[in-house]
């Protein structure tokens, strides 16, 4: 116990990748180890507040195998995990304990997990009793802490999936709450940056694009707002087969109403039209544009008698 107590600073990262740092020495999942080894270690750390029965490990990582081999395989795997951790903790410290057919993380070795920090920051930032400045500071910390989804290299493991979904959803909600506060404080540039980073982690969340387009409009950057609108609607249609929501279409109408720098150079317009005409495939456009184009074409047909 005294040896364990000498270890003061154990930090575990699981968002965006796995790492464990002990007093400045770091082990990451970039090391060439088996996926099952990282699974067992991560599972122990996530459930470090309890004893994990041997049967639970076998059910998670050796399902459907006969009774003898999984037990031996688990013992071998835990031996390898301990050997991997020894350079961090030393030979006198046992980070993993065995007792009565179960295994646990040594409770004397206190770990700080980024997932716990992230969750706590999100909940604190939602406290309406705090000042806007205090909440913004908490949101900024939470946003910086979320470097990616939960254990991405183990995303195919069944036990990882619910955690990954939980933290991903918590992250998205945090970003949207953060953006709402930034909009209230008229910090539109930061709002754009935050929501753009989030869109790189979830490229199919329409609400993020709504926030990006709106923040650009509030900065008077209607050209960039239109470009983001067009790329977002194209991306969502190609991947999900969905049309823009009413909220996004309303932003499009707002872009059109505030557009100041219309192209008036006839030669540039002709060049652009020639380039557009040369593109293969179907022409995807906003419904409002299609309606006006249809009406113009119908009137032309009436005039020409076709």
Language model features with spans:
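Short amphipathic alpha-helical recognition elements used for nucleic-acid or partner binding
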Residues: 29-61, 81
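Intrinsically disordered, charged and Pro/Gly-enriched terminal/linker segments
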Residues: 67, 102-267
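Amphipathic HAMP/coiled-coil signal-transducing linker helices
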Residues: 267-287, 306
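DNA-recognition element of transcription regulators
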Residues: 33-42, 67-89
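Short boundary/linker motifs that mark transitions into or out of structured domains
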Residues: 1-40, 94-102, 268-271
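Short regulatory alpha-helical coupling segments
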Residues: 284-304
